[in-house]
Design a protein with these regions (language model features):
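Short amphipathic helix-loop junctions that connect adjacent transmembrane helices
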Residues: 1-17
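Transmembrane alpha-helical cores of Major Facilitator Superfamily
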Residues: 18-23, 50, 77, 108-116, ...
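Helix-to-loop junctions at the C-terminal end of transmembrane segments
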Residues: 27-44, 129-130
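C-terminal ends and interior cores of transmembrane alpha-helices
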Residues: 50-67
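Intracellular juxtamembrane helix-capping segments at the cytosolic ends
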Residues: 84-99
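A late C-terminal transmembrane helix in Major Facilitator Superfamily
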Residues: 97, 101-130
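A membrane-interface helix-boundary motif in multi-pass transporters
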Residues: 124-147
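Multi-pass alpha-helical transporter architecture, strongest
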Residues: 142-170
């Protein structure tokens, strides 16, 4: 409802999302794989921890400027590149401590756990958006990314994914 509420037509949304959505997600995933291979998991995990809330600020900006097609293109590109990048880095991170004998099981468990907070919060987002308006909503959701940033830094101190022995490999 966000895009429609700020004045985009269904046709505009479909055309722009179709033109940029999947390609940017795949591009983000490929970029994430390249960056993890080049720089390691840790710095890219930190980068994506910052990028995800920043993407929400792009949506706040889009709500502010209104139905500008270039704004929608930028928001979709930013969101999908960030999503693709983040999921590829998160998969690399989840795979890093896994015992190779149980990688599929551990990945299934961890990736399912990853979706729980979002599923829980989804029930409240409509109410929050109604109460705060779209700009306030996206600013608040950007702030909810701060714990992830703090956790990413704490994770690096406790168990740096690029330096931890992998059971079954090391």
């Amino acid at each position: 409802p966000f895009y429609l509420d700020i004045g985009f037509s269904k046709e505009q949304i479909a055309n722009i999302a179709a033109a940029f959505g999947l390609a940017m997600t795949l591009g983000g995933a490929a970029l994430g794989g390249f960056m993890v291979a080049r720089f390691g998991i840790a710095p890219i995990l930190i980068l994506t921890a910052f990028m995800a809330p920043a993407t929400n600020l792009v949506f706040a900006w889009l709500a502010y400027i209104g139905p500008e097609p270039q704004g929608l293109v930028l928001a979709i590109i930013a969101d999908n590149i960030t999503g693709g990048l983040a999921i590829s880095v998160f998969i690399a991170y989840l795979s890093s401590p896994s015992n190779t004998a149980y990688t599929a099981t551990q990945y299934a468990l961890f990736s399912s756990l990853m979706t729980l907070p979002g599923q829980f919060a989804a029930g409240f987002t409509g109410l929050l958006a109604t109460q705060l308006g779209w700009i306030g909503f996206f600013c608040v959701t950007a702030l909810t990314g701060l714990p992830a940033i703090i956790l990413a830094f704490a994770l690096l101190k406790l168990a740096h994914p690029d330096h931890v022995a992998r059971p079954g490999i090391d």
